[in-house]
């Protein structure tokens, strides 16, 4: 799967960060998620949960990031996996959707 770099305004750090990872839409394609699927649910280590519409994921540049500014992210720095959005994403304007320390993903 191709790795992607994305520089974006990180809403909690209040600065620009270059993230690296894979597009969530690419992961759904590799996993052969059917067109009948409607929801991608991500759950963090602290049980915080965010649901995304599959259609929104497929049409977005939402990134499952594993690196920030060239370094792997430890758990105490929002890692090891987190969701980030490009500046142009309307979903990215909602800080509640920036889930970090992702532990699991379910598609239904």
Task: State what each model feature region is.
Residues 1-108:
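N-terminal intrinsically disordered, low-complexity segments enriched in P/E/S/T
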């Amino acid at each position: 799967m191709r790795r992607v770099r994305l520089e974006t305004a990180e809403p909690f750090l209040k600065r620009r960060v270059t993230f690296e990872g894979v597009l969530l839409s690419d992961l759904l394609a590799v996993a052969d998620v059917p067109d009948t699927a409607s929801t991608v649910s991500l759950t963090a280590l602290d049980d915080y949960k965010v649901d995304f519409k599959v259609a929104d994921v497929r049409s977005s540049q939402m990134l499952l990031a594993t690196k920030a500014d060239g370094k792997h992210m430890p758990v105490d720095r929002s890692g090891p996996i987190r969701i980030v959005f490009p500046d142009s994403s309307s979903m990215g304007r909602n800080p509640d959707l920036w889930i970090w320390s992702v532990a699991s993903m379910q598609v239904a």
